[in-house]
Amino acid sequence: QDAAKGEAVFKQCMTCHRADKNMVGPALAGVVGRKAGTAPGFSYSPLNHHSGEAGLVWTQENIITYLADPNAFLKKFLTDKGHADQAVGATKMTFKLANEQQRKDVVAYLATLK
C-alpha cells in the first residue's frame, strides 16, 4: 500500500469528497476506524445508515472491499448480519474502483487523514 500513489488516486474521489468537509459525499478525515454512517452533519442513505447501526466499522480491509462495489458490499454486510430486510435501496456512492492496488493505495492515503 502506497499512500503517495493513493493521494493521486484520491483526485478521482474529489468530485464528491474532501478530507475536511462534507460535499456530495461525507468528509473523509478520520474515516479509517469510524463507524459507518456517522460523519457529523452528513445525510446518509438508509443503506449506509443501517450498515452503521448493524456494526459496520470502516477498517482498511472493509474500505478496500467497499470501493470495488459499494452497494453490493453494504447489502452483503447487512444480509450477513441478519438484516436482509434493511439491505434495500442504494448508497449515494455510485463510483466503483475496479483496480485492487489502487483501492489499497487510496485507503493507505485515507489512513493518513486525521
From Swiss-Prot:
Coiled coil: none annotated. Binds 1 heme c group covalently per subunit. Heme c binds at C13, C16, H17, M93. This is Cytochrome c2. Keywords: Electron transport, Heme, Iron, Metal-binding, Periplasm, Photosynthesis, Pyrrolidone carboxylic acid, Transport. Pfam families: Cytochrom_C (PF00034). It is found in: Periplasm. The keyword rRNA-binding does not apply. Gene3D superfamilies: Cytochrome c-like domain (1.10.760.10). The modification Pyrrolidone carboxylic acid is found at Q1. PANTHER family: CYTOCHROME C. GO terms for molecular function: electron transfer activity; heme binding; metal ion binding. It comes from the Bacteria. One of its GO terms (biological process) is photosynthesis. GO terms for cellular component: periplasmic space. Cytochrome c2 is found mainly in purple, non-sulfur, photosynthetic bacteria where it functions as the electron donor to the oxidized bacteriochlorophyll in the photophosphorylation pathway. However, it may also have a role in the respiratory chain and is found in some non-photosynthetic bacteria. Belongs to the cytochrome c family. The keyword Disulfide bond does not apply. It comes from Rhodopseudomonas palustris.
